[in-house]
Amino acid sequence: MPMTLGYWDIRGLAHAIRLLLEYTDSSYEEKRYTMGDAPDYDRSQWLSEKFKLGLDFPNLPYLIDGSHKITQSNAILRYIARKHNLCGETEEEKIRVDILENQAMDVSNQLARVCYSPDFENLKAEYLEQLPGMMELFSQFLGKQTWFVGEKITFVDFLAYDILDLHLIFEPKCLDAFPNLKDFVARFEGLKKISVYMKTSRFLRTPLYTRVATWGNK
């Protein structure tokens, strides 16, 4: 029986999850919820089901795999990754996985705060000033490795790809000074299953965020 991934009909927190499900050739189907337009942003499609699914902490995204019912995007990623040994093998690799998992979430939240703010234009200018330093840290962490944890791909590469691609949409030149990050993005998009998925109608590069956002909501 296929797994069910539930989320809004946007990219958001499900992007890395969808990519990982495709890369691992997992059998899954999606339940995509639609949010209404302004000013009400009606969420009844989701709210009508929210407390009926047997989730411990009802939220989006969720993954249901038989008796396993999981919320929190990184918990979902780790669940899928454990099935395919994509969590790092040595202690050093696992440390790098843990660091990047949390760093990616921090950066994702920072960008989302800017994009959801009514003061978007002012916050964008401040964010762009910090962006080169932020990307430099990712570049240093990757170094000359093929993937962020070493020569074998792990689930945090899916998070890193999501973060880098988000920022390329936000500021298309943001990786110009970091050839290793540009190469990483190209290498990731060149993975056979990812490349095939990106050509399907199921693939959502945008909208980045829900309709409540000031930027990235289309």
Curated annotation (Swiss-Prot):
Entry-linked Pfam families: GST_C, GST_N
InterPro entries: Glutathione-S-Trfase_C-like, Glutathione-S-Trfase_C_sf, Glutathione_S-Trfase_N, GST_C, GST_mu, GST_superfamily, Thioredoxin-like_sf
GO MF, one annotated term: enzyme binding
Binding site for glutathione: 7-8, 46-50, 59-60, 72-73
Domain of life: Eukaryota
One BP annotation, GO: long-chain fatty acid biosynthetic process
Ranges for domain GST N-terminal: 1-88
Main location: cytoplasm
Residue positions binding substrate: 116
Compartments reported by the entry: Cytoplasm
EC nos: 2.5.1.18, 4.4.1.20
Residue ranges of domain GST C-terminal in the record: 90-208
Catalysed reactions listed for this entry: RX + glutathione = an S-substituted glutathione + a halide anion + H(+); 1-chloro-2,4-dinitrobenzene + glutathione = 2,4-dinitrophenyl-S-glutathione + chloride + H(+); (13S,14S)-epoxy-(4Z,7Z,9E,11E,16Z,19Z)-docosahexaenoate + glutathione = (13R)-S-glutathionyl-(14S)-hydroxy-(4Z,7Z,9E,11E,16Z,19Z)-docosahexaenoate; leukotriene C4 = leukotriene A4 + glutathione
Keywords: Cytoplasm, Lipid metabolism, Lyase, Transferase
One CC-aspect GO term: cytoplasm
Quaternary context: Homodimer.
Family the entry assigns: Belongs to the GST superfamily. Mu family.
General function of this protein: Conjugation of reduced glutathione to a wide number of exogenous and endogenous hydrophobic electrophiles. Catalyzes the conjugation of leukotriene A4 with reduced glutathione (GSH) to form leukotriene C4. Can also catalyze the transfer of a glutathionyl group from glutathione (GSH) to 13(S),14(S)-epoxy-docosahexaenoic acid to form maresin conjugate in tissue regeneration 1 (MCTR1), a bioactive lipid mediator that possess potent anti-inflammatory and proresolving actions.
Protein name: Glutathione S-transferase Mu 4
Organism this protein belongs to: Rattus norvegicus (Rat)
Native organism taxonomy: Eukaryota, Metazoa, Chordata, Craniata, Vertebrata
